């Protein structure tokens, strides 16, 4: 059995094809890495965003390369940079850049107000660093930066999964969900009451699964 894997990193996008041997161990048939190179230049020093559609295009090209060379691949695994989010519309299309884990909007002081990350810590008793997806989303809500057509959000690798499968609503693994912040790792769910307190419409939250 052959398996292909794609990892969407911040600086590179990597892929690998593995074959399961008779002894049960995996053998690497081929690995390949391409530059990400999709950062968007903005006038804000604190802003770290990337062209999401260009990232997906590069990931698709890499996966297509593997599938053409190894047509008997049976499974595809996706991993990628944690914490960041992209917004999607009702059809499952990406309608925003990728707000990466390096984005610092959660640390900005608006006038005499404390940074959003500190407000979350004080009001919700949650530690969520700037760059965590839900910190980014709360900031975007308050500053009218959420795209008008957006209805949900997810990580870049989960969006790639949506792109490949035609899924319209985001479905993310618990490991990715935890990286967005406001996640109860014992109950395996988002802390909806605290999110609502911060002004988040919980209907926007992606579905969460525990299985791979």
Where are these regions (language model features)?
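Surface "functional belts" at beta-alpha junctions
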Residues: 99
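Short, charged, surface-exposed secondary-structure boundary motifs
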Residues: 40-43, 108-112, 182-184
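Acidic-glycine-rich active-site phosphate/pyrophosphate-binding loop
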Residues: 33, 108, 210-212
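Carbohydrate-associated surface elements
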Residues: 103
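Gly/Ser/Thr-rich active-site cleft segment
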Residues: 8-10, 121-212
């Amino acid at each position: 059995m052959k398996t292909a894997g794609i990892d969407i990193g911040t600086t590179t996008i990597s892929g690998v094809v593995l074959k399961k041997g008779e002894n049960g161990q995996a053998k690497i048939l081929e690995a390949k890495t391409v530059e990400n190179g999709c950062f968007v230049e903005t006038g804000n020093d604190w802003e770290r965003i990337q062209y999401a559609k260009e990232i997906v295009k590069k990931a698709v090209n890499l996966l297509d390369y593997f599938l053409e060379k190894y047509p008997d691949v049976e499974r595809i695994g996706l991993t990628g940079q944690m914490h960041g989010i992209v917004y999607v519309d009702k059809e499952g299309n990406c309608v925003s850049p990728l707000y990466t884990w390096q984005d610092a909007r959660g640390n900005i002081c608006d006038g005499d107000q404390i940074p959003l990350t500190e407000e979350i810590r004080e009001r919700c008793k949650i530690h969520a660093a700037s760059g965590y997806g839900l910190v980014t989303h709360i900031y975007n809500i308050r500053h009218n930066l959420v795209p008008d057509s957006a209805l949900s959000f997810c990580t870049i690798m989960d969006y790639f999964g949506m792109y490949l499968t035609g899924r319209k609503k985001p479905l993310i693994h618990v490991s990715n969900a935890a990286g967005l912040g406001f996640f109860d790792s014992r109950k395996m769910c988002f802390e909806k009451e605290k999110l609502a307190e911060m002004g988040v419409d919980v209907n926007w939250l992606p579905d969460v699964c525990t299985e791979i």
